UniProtKB/Swiss-Prot annotation:
Pathway: Metabolic intermediate biosynthesis; 1-deoxy-D-xylulose 5-phosphate biosynthesis; 1-deoxy-D-xylulose 5-phosphate from D-glyceraldehyde 3-phosphate and pyruvate: step 1/1
Molecular-function GO term, any one: 1-deoxy-D-xylulose-5-phosphate synthase activity
Organism: Polaromonas sp. (strain JS666 / ATCC BAA-500)
Keyword Transferase set for record: yes
Protein name: 1-deoxy-D-xylulose-5-phosphate synthase
InterPro entries named among the record's database cross-references: Dxylulose-5-P_synthase, THDP-binding, Transketo_C/PFOR_II, Transketolase-like_Pyr-bd, Transketolase_BS, Transketolase_C, Transketolase_CS
Catalysed reactions, as listed in the record: D-glyceraldehyde 3-phosphate + pyruvate + H(+) = 1-deoxy-D-xylulose 5-phosphate + CO2
HAMAP family: DXP_synth (MF_00315)
GO BP terms, alphabetized: 1-deoxy-D-xylulose 5-phosphate biosynthetic process; isopentenyl diphosphate biosynthetic process, methylerythritol 4-phosphate pathway; terpenoid biosynthetic process; thiamine biosynthetic process
Signal sequence interval, chain numbering: none
Cofactor: Mg(2+); thiamine diphosphate
Assembly, per entry: Homodimer.
Annotated gene: dxs
Binding site residues for thiamine diphosphate: H74, A115, H116, S117, G147, A148, N176, Y283, E365
Amino acid sequence: MYPLLETINSPADLRRLPRAQLKALADELRAFVLDSVSKTGGHLSSNLGTVELTVALHYVFNTPEDRLVWDVGHQTYPHKILTGRRDRMGSLRQFGGLSGFPRRDESPYDTFGTAHSSTSISAALGMALAAHQQGEDRHAVAIIGDGAMSAGMAFEALNNAGVHDDCKLLVVLNDNDMSISPPVGALNRYLAQLMSGRFYASAKNVGKQVLRVAPPLLELAKRLEAHAKGMVVPATLFENFGFNYIGPIDGHDLESLIPTLENIKHLKGPQFLHVVTKKGQGYKLAEADPVAYHGPGKFDPAMGLQKSSAPAKRTFTQVFGQWLCDMAEQDKRLVGITPAMREGSGMVEFHKRFPGRYHDVGIAEQHAVTFAAGMACEGLKPVVAIYSTFLQRGYDQLIHDVALQNLPVVFALDRAGLVGADGATHAGAYDIPFLRCIPNMSVACPADENECRKLLSSAFEQNHPVAVRYPRGAGAGVEPEPGLQPLPFGKGEIRREGSGVAILAFGTLLYPALQAAEKLGVTVVNMRWAKPLDTELLLKVAASHEALVTLEEGAIMGGAGSAVGEALQAAGLGKPLLQLGLKDEFIEHGDPAKLLALQGLDAAGIEAAVMARFGSVLQPEKSGKPAKPALKSVA
């Protein structure tokens, strides 16, 4: 089925192929990617768009000696297939299987781990300068998309790289006019002008002449260097950064890509190659709707994505999106902000209904946070919809620009906790620890969809910054009540009365805690707020129970359990305390339910942990053991 591809077990095999066979190989590679992703789920559109570019890079450069650094990394399936992992693609994004992103511990061809955007140029520059310092003759190539190029970090790296005339650095701009959502901002308009301007047609023709009427390589390299500015718009933005800019060229045309890359290898100083690709290339359904096919689940390629006949549970993202529209209808001060995650964060409907109050700032989390702060200074009520893992990138702005000035910005933190197939790079494991230590900041942890809507309303009515964290996907299936009624600020509730031990649940783990409690006979408290902690309720529960257990889908170290321990200590209460949450480790990709079970955070794991630590204080009929004297404090 894949006669050429099955002969390629490494890029060395690829480089032994005659150039005339590369087009056929690319076709097989694209078909293999489509077949693989349709069976496992994963990123599709971006990978179909990078097939020829991947083939060309591995064909021209001596990988892994020459370093390829893939920005974001979700477009690396062709790269993985060509670098000896073809037979493992059936395990993609599954527990114990291939990662959906580059990982240094997975292959020597994955020279730098990526998953968050805009890091590739910095890493590749570091590699290029390290090679130069150590006297090693190798290239470093950063492959970055036009969406990722909009981030400040990419421009910081360009600014630094442009002064190093002695490094062998190539930046390949993969211009597919898409990030996850369509890219926005002045840079995108600038690239569009390069593509559509009157100069482009003649530039492209000059480029073809230089490439096809080819003298010997050394002479051609000199001509390319001399004529580079004649191939594109003069004094481009990237040339002003100190790069030699070449392009745009067709990123699906191997006859253009390979000679261009071969010639660039002989040029001195930092090089910038602008290639134009199409997301979903070669699969008509993905070409027509690259957003829908950005990260599909399993599907039949012949039929395409199909809507499920079974009614789907409402996701937390959808609950947020509906709340945002409803609150915007009621309060004209509300503005919605997203760093390039309109679809992922549930803001499509808000954008349609309130276009003048919707702001997609691009992949620019630092800017998004301070932009929101500026709006709050002028009396608006900004809501920043952002994944928990991406808020990490705007941490200084969170402290310096929002919290220090005590500005009323709401942070809707999607993908809090484990995220499943995307793995450690996307896990929202750290938001409670890094948020609760900031003065003026509050953190809400809804247990279900109804609480999510109400706690968003609670957050919105505050005059200081508040984050509401909620997980990916659906929850317990509790239908949100209509209206915009808030829950009391900083207050929890007792959900189940028991004895001996009380489980203090923060967020959606309330429901497995309730399941475990039915067998254990213990009390369950829905804490709702990691900050401010409901200390009144906490001390009341502590006084009437012999031991406490905290439960959170987040890092144990510094998390909500730590907050409970601090509060008990401040009150002078020595109370046995068991903290359950995510362990001090990076948690691999896999099925979310399996990952929670492995962390001991499903109902069975919670029951086992409580029994192991506090079985002696449970009712004899629950523990299966004779009653024992009360525990002494270990706090």
